[in-house]
């Protein structure tokens, strides 16, 4: 039976232009030779293909899910947008129960979420719809706890985003800003609970920098060259902290970066730092992101995923990634299932403990590579590996660091390619979405967001011929074709191999 390695270069898109293109600046001899020697095609990795609105850039979660499911899966952004459009959002039982609780207690509704134009973790339209519902239901007090972005939106766009949103809130005559905090603190996903504590303390105890208004807060941070991602936990309205009998709505719809903060509120066994034990506070989330609180909308059960299919066939699988992308090669690739099987081995390689990955752009690519080489020695049938560097370092906006990140990955690819040839593995190289290929605009502005560019697909076997174009939902049907096994009936993607 054939053995296959699927290698995902996270955030590696295709773009011909050289301005702000770290890929064009980097010396990538191994990848260049592979792309010249073996079949290559280009894949769509954004918008409707990955279950997002048309023109929306792909993200690692949606794209890994699309890859692993071999089909388009409606993403939370699209689902909730549609619910708002058809007005059923305003009749959602979870949201109405939370609002009834607030009204019955004559208390405050707190809304916590990322304020961003990126639509990756949250949507401003969802914020506004939730506020509109509160207005309709005559909630008397709403407090916003804004998490500023700077990664999936421009680094200093937060002030305008807040201003635009508050203009709408003021028209409704409802809502004040309680706290502002950068996602560096509130949306950690690598167990940096010292950061999370600062966000929590601002929201619960009103501990943080004090400002008289949000504009002063943002402008002072910008003046000190602190971008949205790193805004220090700041108090805008004194006395705006969560109190007994209040209600709390979390508005992020992606779980992995809000889970640590939520757990500080809802996990009875939480012990990472001292937390307040509320007796009568009601929590809910717009989307199901934590098992301890109700979500207004939940994940659909997805059948026919590649991981489950291989498990049922008895294939020995390895999933390998750094901490930053570990959920993507496991939970998201498996269609939001925590798949468990005696032949499935999940290998987490710790990401380096640094404030920003441009401080160590190599990240732990060497550790990931070592795990892949060991997996080949152990004769796994399918190895899925993700290199986080291109995406994570590109989010810092540091182009020289991105060049180093890419060159580190290229060395790793060389080692994997060589051993794959020796051990009779078919090596398939691709990406989930673009990012590192477009980091500077024509006017010189730094870009840290994902792109809608296509991504490469390379199969390191000259016997195959590939179609010129496809989508990332075609990746697994192609691998199924290489294995010479039947495709799960649920998959709508097609093989990229020309017969």
Kindly label every feature range from the protein language model.
Residues 1-499:
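Feature captures the catalytic ectodomains and active-site-proximal regions of enzymes
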């Amino acid at each position: 039976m054939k053995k296959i390695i699927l290698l995902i270069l996270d955030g590696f898109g295709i773009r011909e232009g050289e301005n702000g293109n770290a890929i064009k600046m980097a010396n990538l001899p191994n990848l260049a030779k592979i792309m010249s020697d073996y079949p290559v095609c280009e894949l769509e990795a954004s918008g409707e293909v990955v279950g997002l609105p048309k023109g929306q850039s792909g993200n690692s979660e949606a794209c890994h899910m699309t890859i692993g499911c071999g089909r388009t899966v409606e993403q939370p952004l699209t689902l909730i947008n549609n619910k708002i459009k058809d007005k059923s959002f305003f009749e959602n039982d979870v949201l109405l129960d939370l609002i009834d609780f607030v009204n019955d207690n004559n208390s405050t509704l707190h809304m916590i979420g990322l304020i961003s134009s990126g639509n990756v973790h949250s949507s401003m339209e969802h914020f506004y719809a939730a506020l509109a519902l509160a207005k309709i239901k005559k909630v008397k007090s709403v407090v916003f706890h804004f998490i500023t972005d700077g990664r999936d939106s421009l680094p200093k766009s937060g002030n305008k985003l807040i201003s635009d949103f508050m203009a709408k809130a003021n028209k409704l005559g409802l809502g004040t800003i309680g706290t502002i905090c950068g996602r560096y603190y509130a949306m950690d996903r690598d167990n940096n609970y010292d950061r999370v504590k600062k966000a929590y303390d601002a929201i619960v105890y009103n501990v943080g920098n004090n400002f008289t208004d949000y504009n002063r807060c943002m402008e002072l941070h910008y003046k000190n060259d602190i971008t949205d991602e790193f805004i220090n936990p700041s108090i805008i309205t004194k006395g705006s902290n969560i109190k007994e009998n209040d209600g709390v709505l979390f508005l992020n719809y992606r779980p992995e970066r809000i889970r640590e903060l939520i757990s500080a509120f809802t996990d009875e066994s939480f012990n990472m730092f001292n937390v307040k034990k509320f007796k009568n506070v009601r929590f809910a989330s717009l989307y199901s992101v934590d098992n301890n609180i109700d979500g207004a909308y939940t994940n659909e059960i997805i059948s026919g995923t590649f991981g489950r299919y291989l498990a049922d066939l008895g294939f020995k699988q390895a999933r390998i990634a750094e901490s930053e992308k570990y959920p993507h090669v496991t939970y998201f690739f498996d269609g939001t299932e925590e798949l468990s099987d005696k032949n499935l081995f999940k290998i987490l390689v710790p990401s380096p403990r640094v404030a920003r990955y441009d401080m160590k752009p190599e990240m732990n690519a060497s550790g990931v590579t070592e795990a892949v080489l060991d997996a080949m020695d152990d004769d796994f049938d399918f190895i899925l590996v993700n290199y986080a560097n291109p995406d994570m370092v590109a989010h810092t906006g540091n182009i020289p660091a991105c060049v180093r990140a890419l060159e580190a990955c290229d060395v790793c690819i060389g080692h994997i390619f060589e051993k794959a040839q020796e051990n009779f593995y078919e090596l398939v190289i691709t990406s989930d979405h673009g990012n590192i290929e477009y980091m500077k605009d024509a006017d010189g502005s730094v870009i840290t967001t994902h792109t809608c560019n296509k991504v490469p697909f390379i199969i390191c076997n000259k016997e195959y011929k590939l179609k010129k174009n496809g989508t990332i939902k075609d990746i697994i049907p192609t691998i199924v074709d290489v294995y010479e096994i039947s495709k799960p009936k649920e998959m709508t993607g097609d093989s990229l191999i020309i017969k």
